[in-house]
């Protein structure tokens, strides 16, 4: 009898611990989502207009925990409410937040920004610097500008029942943080607002490409998902920067 009671007690203890783990996990996810939304508002609330704000035309379609340079981050994806090009590699507004609430990056990939005149390099640098001053001032302390040049991001669209890829081009302000050797950049779109921002990126010098994961870039994410079961090393995945 004592043995049966001991066995039953052990089973109940296991189930109770499992229940507590699941409960804490769900609470943690909820808090993370709330903190991410709050942090985005805090990080961008002081920025001109709504350059890094979640567009009113979009809604949250996915949110998950991933790793960036071996550290936990939260990836959130917003797609258009009207369903226009609402698929992987299509239009989206995405954010990446660190566990401490730091905005690690965001991307606003919109068809509205394609095929329009771009601001000058001088104007783009001014816009990028002002964005950093308000949203990530710590990056300005030891900043070394590397380049200011046009850069394109692909977006797949459906037009008249046919799928095609167009390029959303902006002016990329690329710089290095001399304090730790990491890289960061701001891409200014045709509307003279930041359309993409990434920070604390690690670089593979010998391979002339970034080491950090590319969670804001659908082409990389798609390849990651497709090869996930094969556990393919990330060095074999496509790199866009």
Regions from the language model: what does each represent?
Residues 2-4, 11-241:
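Long, terminal "pre-/pro-" and other extracytoplasmic accessory regions
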């Amino acid at each position: 009898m004592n043995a049966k009671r001991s066995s039953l007690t052990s089973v109940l203890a296991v189930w109770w611990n499992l229940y507590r783990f699941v409960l804490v996990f769900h609470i943690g996810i909820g808090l993370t989502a709330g903190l991410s939304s709050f942090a985005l508002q805090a990080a961008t609330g002081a920025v001109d207009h709504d350059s890094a704000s979640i567009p009113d035309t979009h809604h949250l379609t996915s949110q998950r925990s991933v790793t960036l340079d071996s550290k936990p981050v939260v990836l959130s994806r917003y797609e258009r409410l009207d369903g226009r090009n609402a698929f992987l590699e299509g239009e989206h507004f995405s954010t990446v937040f660190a566990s401490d609430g730091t905005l690690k990056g965001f991307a606003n990939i919109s068809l509205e920004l394609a095929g329009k005149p771009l601001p000058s390099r001088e104007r783009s640098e001014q816009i990028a610097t002002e964005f950093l001053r308000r949203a990530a001032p710590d990056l300005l302390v030891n900043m070394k500008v590397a380049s200011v040049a046009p850069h394109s991001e692909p977006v797949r669209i459906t037009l008249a029942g046919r799928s095609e890829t167009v390029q959303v081009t902006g002016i990329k302000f690329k710089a290095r943080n001399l304090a730790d050797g990491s890289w960061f950049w701001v891409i200014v779109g045709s509307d003279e607002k930041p359309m993409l921002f990434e920070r604390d990126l690690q670089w593979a010098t010998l391979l002339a490409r970034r080491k950090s994961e590319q969670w804001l870039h659908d082409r990389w994410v798609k390849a990651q998902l497709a090869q996930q079961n094969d556990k393919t090393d990330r060095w074999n995945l496509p790199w866009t920067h």
